[in-house]
């Protein structure tokens, strides 16, 4: 039952936002009483924390599996983007913004964990890309890594890119293209063009 609650809460939070979904909504969706939910989660904050932890672990594991594969660094970045988009269900509402606004402590912990994971993954990706000649060798690794992470969070910022004006999926595509085309060599650009031509 606890896993059912967690998975349904994740679905509702991603579709409608962390603030918008109430414990009553969750209980109704599951066909159970709120008392049953409180047997596993002391309050909504505890549930939000559990959902964000679950999402983070799921996405981190998926990204690790992609990085352990045989893709070249550019293909790897496109695969990670698609996996993350799918795992977040295209962020149909603005869960990132609501989490930041209404659960700032949980958000701060999540951002720290995300940065550590993305920093390691991105730096390894760039190093391999340089070795293969598809990324420029004059890249400032620390700067580019942090800029990529900053951009990843910026495109999810509701005030900068409001959902009623910008398509989140398109924003992720634009952000990745901005990142890769800025660091790619002519050889790397050929790979990017081939991948984007298929999509």
Regions found by a protein language model. Give the residues of each.
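Hydrophobic alpha-helical connector segments
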Residues: 50, 64-91, 145-148
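Short secondary-structure transition hinges
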Residues: 89-124, 131-135, 143
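All-alpha amphipathic helical-bundle segments outside canonical DNA-binding/catalytic cores
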Residues: 75, 113, 131-147, 165-170, ...
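Helix-turn-helix
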Residues: 4, 8, 12-46, 50
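Short, basic, alpha-helical segments at the C-terminal edge of helix-turn-helix-like DNA-binding modules
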Residues: 53-60
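Secondary-structure edge/capping motif, primarily at the C-terminal ends of alpha-helices
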Residues: 66, 95-99, 159-162
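C-terminal peripheral helix-coil segments that are non-catalytic and often amphipathic
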Residues: 124-128, 132, 165-199
């Amino acid at each position: 039952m606890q896993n059912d609650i967690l998975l349904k809460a994740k679905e509702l939070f991603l579709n409608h936002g962390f603030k918008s979904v109430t414990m009553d909504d969750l209980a109704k969706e599951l066909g159970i009483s709120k008392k049953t939910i409180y047997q596993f989660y002391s309050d909504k904050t505890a549930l939000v924390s559990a959902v964000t932890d679950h999402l983070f672990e799921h996405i981190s594991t998926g990204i690790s599996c992609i990085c352990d594969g045989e893709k070249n660094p550019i293909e790897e970045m496109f695969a990670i983007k698609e996996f993350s988009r799918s795992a977040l269900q295209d962020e149909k509402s603005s869960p990132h913004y609501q989490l930041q606004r209404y659960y700032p402590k949980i958000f701060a912990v999540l951002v720290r964990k995300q940065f550590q994971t993305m920093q390691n993954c991105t730096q390894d990706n760039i190093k391999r890309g340089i070795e293969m000649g598809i990324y420029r060798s004059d890249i400032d690794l620390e700067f580019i890594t942090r800029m990529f992470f900053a951009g990843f969070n910026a495109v999810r910022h509701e005030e900068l890119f409001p959902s009623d004006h910008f398509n989140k999926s398109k924003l992720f595509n634009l952000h990745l293209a901005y990142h890769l085309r800025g660091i790619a060599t002519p050889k790397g650009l050929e790979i990017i063009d081939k991948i984007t031509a298929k999509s």
